[in-house]
Amino acid sequence: VALVTFKEVEKIFFKDRSTSYAALRGFNLEIDDREFFCLLGPTGCGKTTVLNLLAGFERPTGGAIELAGIPVTGPGRDRAVVFQGDDSLYAWLTARENIEFGPRARGVPAKERRALADSYLNLVGLRGQGDKHPHELSGGMKQRIQIARVLANEPRMLLMDEPFGALDAQTRRVMQRELTKIWQATHTAVLFITHDIDEAIILGDRIGVMRAGPESNLKAIVEVRMEGIHDRNHPRFIEYYRQVHALIEEEVNQTLSQEGAG
C-alpha cells in the first residue's frame, strides 16, 4: 500500500498577473511505506517543487497529494525535512539539546528525552559527541545531528533535499554509507532529491527520473537492487548508471535542441 500518492498534480508559479510558470503538470507518483525513493533529473525540472509540495510548504495548483490516505494541506509532524546546509541546527544548543528540541516541545520528560537523544546519537555514529556545540563539529557530523534531530520526532517520512551537496566528495561517500545504515535500522520512508546519479543508485530502492521543465512530470522509474553494495565498479552499478544516464541525457539533449531551434 502506498504511503504517499501524487495524483495529476499541477504547480503553477505566478510571477505577476500576466506571467506564470508551470513547474509541474500531470505529475503522478506513489511511494511505499519504508521505501527509499530518489528523485533525479536535469536542473530546473521541479525536483525541489515536488519535495516542497509534499512537505506542505507549497500548495498544488491542481491535483491531490496524500500521505497515509490523508490530504497534505500544510506542514506536519509526520514529515521531517533535512536540508543541504547545517543552518537549521541551533548554534547555542549542544548536539544532544538539538536532538531533544522536538521531544521537549512535545512534553517528553527530561530523563526520557536524554535517553532518546543518546540513542539517536548512537544510531548516527556520534556517541560521546552530545555535549559539543555545532561549531565544534565537522560538516558531516552536523548533517548527522540534523538527521538524528528529525528522527527523534518520529516522522512517518524523511524529505531530504540534496542534504550532502555541500560536503566534499569523501565526506559525502561516508554520509551515504551512514544514511544507508540509519535507514536500514529505522526503515522510515525517504524522498531523497539529488542531481547525482551515483548517489541515487547507491541509496535508492527506486529512482524517479523527471522530464526537463517546464510542465515537468515523471519520465521513468528505475528499480534498483544494489542490496547495500557501495562499489561503483560493480557490474550492477555500471548497468544502472548507463540506464539512468541515458534517460537524463535524452532530456538534456531535447532541451538543448529546443533552445537551439528557438
What function would you assign to each model-found segment?
Residues 40-42:
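The feature captures the beta-strand-to-loop junction immediately N-terminal to the Walker
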Residues 100, 111-129, 181:
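Conserved ABC ATPase "signature" region
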Residues 63-75:
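Conserved ABC transporter NBD signature motif
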Residues 133-137, 141:
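Conserved ABC ATPase signature
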Residues 152-156:
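A short, proline-enriched helix->beta-strand linker immediately N-terminal to the Walker B motif
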Residues 55:
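Helix-to-loop junction immediately C-terminal to a conserved catalytic motif
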Residues 93-100:
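Short coil-to-helix segment of the ABC ATPase nucleotide-binding domain corresponding to the Q-loop/switch region
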Residues 158-161:
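Catalytic Walker B motif of ABC-type/P-loop ATPase nucleotide-binding domains
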